Amino acid sequence: MNILVVNDDGYQAEGLAILVKALAPFGNVYVSAPKTHQSAKSHAITIKNRIETFVSVPIFGSTATLVVDGTPSDAVRLGLKVFDIDFDLVVSGINYGANIAKDIMYSGTVAAAFEAKILGVDAIAMSAPNTNLPYLYDETIKLFDELIETKLYEYDGILNINFPKETYQRPKGVKITTQGLRLQHAEFVKSEKPDIFHIKGSIINYQEHPESDVVAFDDGYVSITPLKLDRTDYSKIKDILETEN
């Protein structure tokens, strides 16, 4: 099995190291990762500038490593091109910080998985509130034992996996979840220097669906949320057509 690992925290990130080592028993693990931290880059790709890459000494026990001076989605595209082999799976992560609810709209980790799917390769995004969690390596192996055996990722979307909040010593289990509603109120705050702003956010609490990734995260469960590229609101189309008729 050939597996490509990407991330948005950069090629030196601890979460990347854990993921590569955890996937090693399942096949040949290749790495294509950004040179620098790329959080919240979402699905950005580089279109006007050239992208510098270099083949590194294989890191974390990988078969081969490519470092990309670009976005997470750039790293996916270039990894698939430069290595030029048939990959069975792309895994993006392990991200430092959860990617639940609205987070997926901004997440470079989730976008990298979607980019792989656009290019025809099955993909999984994986995130944790903290990559220093003592159980993370063992639980990641346990998850992939099940995922690879069942091939749950083989469909026309991706799987978005999140480990629970770090107040739990270990996950209570795994839940298949929906995307939650948790939103943030974000505003730009002026800094001490003139014309310089930084973003400040606060959580807006909603009544979450009990089967959402937010509830699973808060209750101590690993969440697996199937996500699709198609964002069409079919119920709204139906409403419009019924109104017109």
What are these regions (language model features)?
Residues 9-17, 194, 207:
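Short acidic, Gly/Ser-rich segments with clustered Asp/Glu that frequently serve as metal-coordination loops
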Residues 3, 14-86:
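A cross-family phosphate/adenosyl-ligand binding-site feature
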Residues 117-137:
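Glycine-rich phosphate/pyrophosphate-binding loops
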Residues 89:
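Short, Asp-centered acidic motifs that coordinate Mg2+ and/or phosphate
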Residues 5-12, 103-104:
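Short, glycine-rich nucleotide/cofactor-binding loops
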Residues 137-245:
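Electrostatically charged, flexible surface regions
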Residues 79-84, 113-122:
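Alpha-helix C-terminal capping segments
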Residues 98-107:
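Glycine/threonine-rich flexible loop motifs
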